[in-house]
């Protein structure tokens, strides 16, 4: 499904060059749930952002179903990102003035799909993540765990092939974080959606199909 080859990423810093990814190679199979672990600064989030086309590599390639995603135009990348990749971040990034249902619908609305077409899908997803009774609550009326469940529902609305989750439990207490991870594991199995999750939590990463260890910009 995804092949990362000889990936490097460098940034200019104070007249010098900081290299945060150093020749990364990685294969991700369809339907896997992969945990990426490592110390802060190891390059985990940078790798995730490049796979999701939120950033570009300095050198190297990322192939998605055989296609080099960085040969796409910016517009094609944006469409690819919206249709085929879902994102969950440490902070939920929900729009505070909109309800849980409206937030979950947002990726499809960006694609100019009609609300009456997508609301049943969004309601079903929110029910699937345990929020059937919270559809019309705004983010400020939801707990941290509930906010992240809305974010997961939003990530899945377009039926993406891949969900990229960057420390999705980082702002949650232990019990809530474990429940969220268990929910993503269930969705992975039930839907066959590929999940790549960055986490510092060893207990959670142990539940993944595969653990990818990163250190100093490399997979070790």
Q: Where in the sequence are the language-model features?
A:
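ABC family nucleotide-binding domain
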Residues: 2-214
């Amino acid at each position: 499904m995804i092949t990362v080859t000889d990936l490097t990423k460098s940034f200019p810093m104070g007249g010098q060059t900081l290299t945060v990814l150093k020749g990364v190679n990685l294969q991700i199979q369809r339907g896997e749930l992969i945990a990426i672990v490592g110390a802060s600064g190891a390059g985990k989030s940078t790798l995730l952002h490049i796979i999701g086309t939120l950033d570009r590599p300095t050198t190297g390639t990322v192939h998605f179903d055989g296609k080099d995603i960085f040969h796409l135009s910016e517009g094609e990348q944006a469409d690819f990102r919206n249709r085929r990749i879902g994102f969950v971040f440490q902070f939920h990034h929900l729009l505070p003035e909109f309800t849980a249902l409206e937030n979950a619908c947002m990726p499809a609305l960006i694609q100019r799909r009609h609300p009456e077409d997508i609301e049943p899908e969004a309601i079903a997803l929110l029910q699937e993540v345990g929020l059937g009774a919270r559809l019309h609550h705004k983010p400020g009326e939801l707990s941290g765990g509930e906010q992240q469940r809305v974010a997961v529902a939003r990530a899945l609305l377009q039926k993406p092939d891949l969900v990229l989750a960057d420390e999705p439990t980082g702002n949650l207490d232990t019990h809530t974080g474990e429940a969220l991870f268990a929910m993503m594991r269930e969705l992975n199995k039930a839907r066959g959606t590929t999940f790549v999750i960055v986490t510092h939590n060893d207990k959670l990463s142990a539940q993944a199909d595969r653990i990818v260890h990163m250190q100093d910009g490399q997979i070790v």
